[in-house]
């Protein structure tokens, strides 16, 4: 797309139409050209008070302009109030009094992310931006916006639209049967001429450049309904790698009427990588990525009904590719997909690639896949799917036919400890343990993966003071137990086999935490949250107790009710009841009392 540089348009003023202002952070900060300043709304008092309300800002251009797209920059700090999930943009054309129909957008939950909304309108004098106050699953109490920008496409855009007559539809992915090499000479834009020429010669590779995409239920709404962490916001990969600043032509064609916002998220999970979201609309989209990274379609509905499919063509997109069992990929298709990725990754340091099972969505480097799984990948996704299925069983989702279609995202990260960040589970510098079944089953690796997945699966009423690192461990402990007899498993169980020296003991013993709980509870008569506890080194006056010792009585109930098959639905019933009683006003004490009531009911 050489020679297709966009022009940033001048904005004369900004006016707050609906909403309020926090301190001196008014809307003028969104047109000062400084990403370090921002507009911020003031709180309405609670997340519930924010629900159904929006911030509306009206921008006036210096003169009427043809607008290609609008860019919204989210505030770059990590505060949850910096993140907005949805909204819309509408325009008022010069000489008109009626605003155009609003174009909706959804945004990545990432601080500092750019949100591009394709507008494609002529002679626009004013732009209104609406941002929803509430972000599902985040519980923010205000909205922040760092910068508003308007861009105009180059004149070449009209030449591209004129060339559509050579193609069968508006995706520009197939030529009409009457097209000849001679007639192609009428095409004025070099990139479209080259596209048509390669299509005519049978040389254009559409494997990942052209695909049909399906809608899915919003991962934030799934999380809110089940009172758990978000499912993958990158569950719909394109297999295309985008380079910062390099324009790409994206052709979009809906297969029916749709009112669901459609976006392209570009996420770079390499060290120091950034993320952005670009709103797409039917027809031609000329995009300029604000960052490099892999592309993902975000086409989210509010319920399970779904929306019409959409065909998308990324013209000459760089194909990293991906493997997805739901698309019909198997071990037979894996070598060709991996080889394509290796070729494309030659000039992309630490290029990342996605694999998707029925339950999980995993990302690692192309080099890691080539090293750890050069010939087959099915067993890799199967073992992670199996682990997650046991967590869903414990949550009551299997029994109640409520397992979400949305997948869970796990990523190879670049430093620190394994963690759950609200969007994905991060596993630093993890390759073999994620991608080699024999290593995955070694000692505590199932526990490590299940622990971070477990944080994302913690039911709201089953975590909090004292249980943040406990109820998620119940998931991974159960998964480790249920997978102990798998062919590659060493049979290792952390609670039963890991050595631990309880207070007062002369030496560490295997299963020492079980011994510690029995000694602290039955001999020393210490209360539950004081067992194997010490004063915090960084929180004066706060007692911290061993989370594995606190897990023991919960694990005993698992063994009695579920392993011994006394009440195999014990934990599913306890958690399912908790999911449907998510009163956020409950104190920690009330939550524990409610848990005991639910446990009594489930054990009856």
Region roles according to the model:
Residues 51-54, 65, 79-157:
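Trp- and acidic/polar-enriched beta-sheet ligand-binding modules for extracellular glycan
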